[in-house]
């Protein structure tokens, strides 16, 4: 049985072990999760998997807490989805429960030095915890240690940080990239030319997923990767960059492996080029789903790597559980990719949908990183609400 078939079975029914992982701390994670989501054959070698320094730690700050969100970028619809969840749903319910007072947001526009400065300022101004998103895995490390020394923990959503003082939460990106590549290769018959569209090079979320795609395609000798294009996880950039490449190259393309958040723009570029509408990986952009909803034979599934609202709630829940002293076992809590078929998409995307929609699908925290799932990674796991 191929990994693709195993992944499909696991995601549709239950986790099935595919390999054993020999690591003391991972031995404390249930085998079905460990052998699938933490399979070393599909793990970024730089993913932190040691015991968390927060295992016997509890915040000494009184409730309610203020969390600083040091965002690295604001220029795409994915980040918009994060903000909508944090301020539209999460903060109000946590305020009502007496857990949070506020979430303070900064933006650094992909400049590490600015993000570092903002994290230090947030720490010095008295926030009780920090979350960051999609950041350089190494550059922030001294600042994370600085915050830790002040009693302020840092959680990363959508990509790992290598500091021993960081908490990382995300999908297993290398596994997800491999799955997307395997799915696309099988969809186009195991042969042909493909274009990979990565997100923001240099961020762990982009790089890990990109490597997973390369590894997946490498297992198909008749598949050729003819281009690797960065699109900054932004539809407008994806459209412009792909249009540029398509106009400059006559190479036949049989499929597109697009990191989600850029797929609406990539789809627009392909459609406007006059080329055949060949399979493309979709992962949550409603504009792209609009096309698929009305062309149901286009592909057979969407594969989610990071539904924005759910990814944000995932990180916040882990951070707050840690601050409450629940005993975080491991440095990185990882989840598997999630998928939906066209019938599901048609249930929430209307026929008269907007191809230029700026909305992004969220699958629900109960499907992405449920309280039951998170409990496996804490010594004394308990839902916040």
Stretch-by-stretch model annotation:
Residues 9-17:
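Bacterial N-terminal signal peptides
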Residues 23-65, 216, 307, 313-385:
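Hinge/cleft segment of the Venus flytrap/periplasmic-binding protein
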Residues 26-28, 34-93, 104-116, 133-137, ...:
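Extracytoplasmic "Venus flytrap"
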Residues 46-54, 115, 168-194, 208, ...:
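Hydrophobic alpha-helical segments within soluble ligand-binding/sensing domains
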Residues 67-75, 86-90, 178-228, 319-353:
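An alpha-beta-alpha
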Residues 92-109, 194-196, 217-236:
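Short beta-strand elements in bilobed, periplasmic/extracellular small-molecule ligand-binding domains
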Residues 122-124, 128-148, 213, 227, ...:
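Hydrophobic alpha-helical
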Residues 137-175, 186, 193, 286-299:
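Flexible loop/hinge segments that line or gate small-molecule binding clefts
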């Amino acid at each position: 049985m191929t990994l693709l078939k195993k992944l499909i079975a696991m995601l549709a029914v239950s986790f099935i072990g595919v390999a054993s992982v020999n690591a003391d701390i991972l031995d404390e994670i249930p085998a079905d999760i460990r052998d699938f989501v933490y399979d070393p054959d599909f793990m970024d070698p730089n993913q932190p998997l040691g015991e968390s320094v927060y295992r016997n730690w509890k915040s000494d700050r009184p409730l309610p807490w203020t969390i600083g969100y040091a965002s690295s970028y604001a220029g795409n619809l994915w980040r918009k989805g994060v903000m909508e969840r944090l301020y539209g749903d999460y903060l109000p319910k946590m305020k009502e429960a007496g857990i949070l007072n506020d979430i303070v947001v900064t933006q650094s526009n992909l400049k590490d030095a600015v993000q570092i400065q903002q994290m230090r300022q947030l720490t010095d101004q008295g926030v009780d915890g920090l979350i960051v998103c999609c950041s350089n895995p190494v550059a922030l490390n001294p600042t994370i240690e600085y915050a830790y020394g002040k009693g302020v923990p840092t959680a990363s959503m959508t990509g790992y940080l290598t500091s021993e003082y960081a908490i990382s939460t995300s999908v297993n990106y290398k596994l997800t990239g491999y799955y997307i590549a395997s799915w696309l290769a099988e969809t186009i018959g195991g042969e042909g030319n493909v274009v990979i569209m990565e997100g923001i090079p240099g961020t762990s979320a982009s790089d890990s997923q990109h490597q997973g795609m390369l590894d997946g395609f490498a297992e198909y000798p008749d598949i050729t990767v003819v281009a690797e294009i960065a699109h900054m996880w932004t539809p407008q950039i994806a459209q412009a960059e792909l249009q540029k490449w398509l106009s400059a190259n006559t190479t036949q393309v049989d499929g597109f492996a697009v990191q989600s958040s850029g797929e609406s723009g990539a789809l627009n570029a392909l459609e406007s080029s006059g080329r055949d509408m060949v399979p493309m990986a979709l992962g949550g952009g409603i504009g792209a789903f609009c096309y698929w909803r009305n062309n149901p034979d286009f592909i057979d599934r969407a594969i989610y790597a990071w539904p924005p609202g759910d990814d944000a709630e995932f990180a916040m829940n882990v951070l707050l559980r840690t601050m409450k002293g629940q005993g975080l076992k491991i440095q990185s809590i990882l989840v598997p990719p999630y998928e939906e078929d066209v019938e599901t998409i048609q249930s929430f995307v209307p026929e008269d949908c907007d191809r230029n929609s700026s909305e992004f699908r969220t699958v629900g925290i109960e499907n992405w990183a449920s309280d039951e799932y998170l409990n496996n990674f804490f010594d004394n796991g308990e839902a916040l609400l």
